[in-house]
Structure formats: C-alpha cells, structure tokens
Amino acid sequence: MHRLLQTQPKNFLTTFANLYNSMNKINYQKELDRVIEKITGVGKVPKLLLHVCCAPCSSYCLEYLSKYFDITVYFYNPNISIADEYNYRLSEEKRLVSLMPFEHPVKVIEGEYLPKDYFEYVKGLENEPEGGKRCEKCFRLRLESSARYAKEHGFDYFTTTLTISPLKNAQLLNSIGAELAEKYGIPWLYSDFKKREGYKRSIILSKEYDLYRQNYCGCVFSKRDSVTAEN
C-alpha cells in the first residue's frame, strides 16, 4: 500500500492525506462528555485552568463548564501587542465574570504580559496566512504557559476557549494540548466548544452582556489581514 502511494503524483498524495485526516477526526465533544460523566457526582469539584482569549469566546465556555468545574480563567495573550486592546479585552473578561451567574466559583488571573516573547517566538513567520504556521506557534506558546501554570498550582485539568471559534482548528489545538499534557503531567480537557451551537450561544451571550467583539484575533498580523480583507 505504501509503495503504491509513493508512485502517485504529489497532488494525489495531498488529497489522500486530507481525506484520511477528515475520516479519522476525533469527536472532541464526545471526549469532553466522557470526562464530565466521570467527574459528575463523585463529591469533589475538579479545578480547571481555562486559558481565555477574550470575553465573547469565554462566555459560552464558562456557562457550560462552571456546572462541573471550579474554574480559574487564565488570561495569557502576549500576541495582543497593542496595550490598549489587551487591557480592554482583559477588563471585559473581568466584567463578564463579575456579572455571570455560576454554579461553582470562577476567578480571573492574568498571565505575564510580554509581547516581545510572542514576536520572538513567531520570528520568520510574519507573512504566514492567518490559520497557518504562525498561528500554530501562537497556540503552542499560550497553551504551554497554561500547562506550566496548571501543573505548578495543582490544577486537575487545563484547556482553552480557542476551540469555540469556527476559524480555529480544534484538531490542532487538542493535539497540542495533549502533547503538553504529557510533557507536564497535567490532564488536558479535550474540547470543541463550537459543537452543539456553542459559537451561536456565545454570540447571544455577548449581546446579552454587551461585550466588546473584536474583528481580529489579536496579533498585529491578524489585524493587518483583517484590514486588507475589508478593503
């Protein structure tokens, strides 16, 4: 089989690889369901470190997960290099948490804000398209910080709100999370929050709480691409 594939043109191999990956995608919502079923009714509420990118994306995730976890929001986003934008998104997250009703405690902590770390980490990838290699590195930077913090502070799980976006690759995010879970010895909570209309629910909650909804992901490169697309 492998020898046969090696004789095919490159475009055939690419098509085959894409087809194979699409047929073997993991349903991460079902993985999350299994964890929730396991922890429900055991008498102890597990501690979850939830990496949050912005208030709108976190709205549904918090509504959903706070039924089962004691959550600490980890706002670590050095990719947002414009300080005013960063501070506004952080203040909106804090405001949302102060307003939403939760079954279990939710608090917000801020990770170290050093945009230079982000620029050094993605150096050479400045002209990559949105969703490409630069974004993959950005995911890894933020999730690695989350994994390290979760391990050092005794959390039971860590995860991110990033999978709620239709523009973010949940397969990639969960793959990175699982890799870091093994590296740091802290369980990764699988997710695909856009499932079960989670993204639509986040839009409803954003309107309900009058949340600031930015039109770009966060870095200056995504802002550049957003402006280009609008023109």
Regions found by a protein language model. Give the residues of each.
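Low-complexity, intrinsically disordered or signal/transmembrane-proximal segments
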Residues: H2, Q6-Q8, Y20
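Intrinsically disordered/low-complexity terminal segments and short unstructured peptides
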Residues: Q6, L13-T14
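Nucleotide-activated chemistry modules centered on ATP-dependent adenylation/adenylyltransferase
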Residues: F12-L13, L19-Y60, L65-N231
